[in-house]
Every structure is written in C-alpha cells, then in structure tokens.
C-alpha cells in the first residue's frame, strides 16, 4: 500500500475514534518513509544443510524467516547483518538453536545515529566467549569501518528476551551518541530511544508547542526511557 494511502487510512481511523470528542488535525507524515529505523534486530540460525540465516521469527514459532533487507531499516544495519552471516561461516561459529538450547550465536542488534552517523553492533551469544574474538572484530571493522563500537552481550537463558544482563565492550566506547531536537543523547545497547528520529523531532516539537510551557512547570519524568521528552522540553 502506498505511503499516502496508509496515511489516509490512519486519518480515517483517527477521525472515527475521536470525532465524538474533538476535532482532528491532518496527520503529519514523513518526507521519506524509508530506511528510517535506527534500531535493527536479527535472530540467527541455520538451515538443515548448515547454511547460516538471519531474520525474524515467524509469529508464535522459533522458525526463522530470512530477511536480507527491509524497506524501513537503516541500510547500514542490514548490510552489517548480512556480512556477519558470512563471517560466522568463515570463523566456523555455530548459531544457537532455540529449541535444543545448543549453539553459541543468537542475535545481532545494530543501533545507528541518525544525525551523528555513529554505529553500534551488539553480538548476542549464549556464552561469554567468542572464538577468535579479536580477529572477528578486526574482520567486521574492515568490512564496515563506519562501526564505532562493538559489544558482546551474553544471554544464556531460554527466553524470548534478546539481551542478557552481562556485556563486554570489544571495540569503542560501548555506546553511541546522537542528536535529537538540538540535544545530544548517549545511547547504550539497552537504552529506550525512539526508533524514528525524523518523526520524533516533529512530534516533540509540535507537542512542546501545543503545551504552551512557561518555564515554571515542574515535570515528573516517569517511564521516560533516556529522558528525551523532559530534557528537550526543559
């Protein structure tokens, strides 16, 4: 469905729900609704013939639907994930099997800075030991010199959660920074940060404008992620 048609359908739904209570304004859409997502996750596995695959789970199963690229994901993230598949084969690293609990390599999480261009790669393993980790990191950085930090995250639990508690920084600072509405934010692997930077800036700007703040308000920034709304509004 074309993006403009999607907006029309959303507008109809919003009008239907809110018409009894208030007037509605026109939805503010994106100028370019492609490759905007700054957080990309891929689960790793293998086919019966041993071919390494990555993608997303089919709903309600542990069956991996292979994904090479997605129209809403940052192109750099998709390219990094594809190349990691090849590196696993080269380094003979086994992927994790959710059903049996055997294997090592589980997920990859890539976070990108919309304005800064910084790139974080998180390798999620079932064990704290990545074979030949120095050479693996060098090989990945050679393929993608745009990467600013690489993190090894350990998740050895049988869970649908992607990230575990323990992390080791393999390269870089262990975080990236990005700008949102003129403010610089530090983003870690586990930070809650809006995935669509362009629309987030439009949303926050409009919300703050409509709030009519005087500077005398006191804000309780509960459930705030990394505090973007409160900090920008202040």
What are these regions (language model features)?
Residues 1-234:
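Accessory RNA-recognition modules of RNA-modification enzymes
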């Amino acid at each position: 469905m074309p993006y403009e048609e999607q907006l029309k359908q959303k507008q109809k739904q919003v009008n239907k729900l809110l018409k009894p209570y208030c007037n509605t304004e026109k939805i503010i859409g994106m100028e370019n609704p492609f490759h905007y997502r700054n957080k990309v996750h891929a689960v790793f596995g293998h086919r019966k013939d041993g071919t390494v695959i990555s993608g997303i789970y089919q709903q309600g199963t542990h069956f991996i639907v292979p994904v090479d690229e997605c129209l809403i994901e940052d192109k750099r993230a998709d390219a990094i994930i594809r190349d990691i598949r090849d590196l696993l084969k080269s380094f003979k690293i086994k992927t994790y099997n959710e059903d049996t609990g055997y294997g090592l390599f589980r997920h990859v999480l890539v976070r990108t800075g919309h304005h800064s261009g910084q790139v974080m790669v998180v390798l999620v393993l079932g064990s704290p030991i990545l074979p030949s980790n120095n050479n693996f990191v060098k090989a990945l950085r050679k393929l993608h010199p745009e990467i600013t930090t690489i993190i090894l995250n350990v998740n050895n639990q049988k869970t649908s959660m992607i990230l575990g508690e323990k992390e080791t920084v393999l390269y870089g600072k262990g975080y990236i920074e990005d700008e949102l509405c003129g403010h610089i934010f530090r983003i870690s692997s586990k930070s809650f940060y809006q995935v669509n930077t362009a629309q987030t800036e439009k949303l926050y700007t409009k919300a703050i404008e409509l709030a009519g703040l005087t500077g005398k308000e006191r804000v309780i920034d509960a459930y705030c992620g990394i505090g973007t709304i409160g900090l920008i509004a202040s």
